[in-house]
Amino acid sequence: MPTEQDAELTLLKGHLLIEEILTAVIMNGVKRPKHLDFARMQFHQKMKLARAVFPGEDPDWIWVALKSLNDARNKLAHGLDQAATATAVKKLIDYVLNFDPISGEVLERGEEPPQPLNWILFSLYSYLIVYGDVVPPRRNQLLEHLSSLPATHD
């Protein structure tokens, strides 16, 4: 992620990374993902479909936060009003810090993390990966190969 000085780039890259995870959640959650045109889907459509197939817990805060992330990104991408973008980013940060269980355990109430935008993007990304089960455990290929060999008796 970019440094805190470039909040706009951080917002855009974070949005893209989270969109990739939403796509992975959808691909894991539907029987025939090849029939979906992910390239033409917008973030909010992926968000709704990912929520419909989400295998983990379904707390409202994560989906509200993702909508807020998309709103902030859209303000940045479609407008020249830096104040509106900054307000949307601040709203997103405040919301996630208030509801994210990781932030609640690590930070003191009212404490702001060192790079708040990076912090909350990491938090959203991590939540989706863990509870969305998008990184399935891979079996060790060597173990898989050895298991397929016929047993030998010495």
Where are these regions (language model features)?
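Amphipathic alpha-helical interface elements
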Residues: 1-154
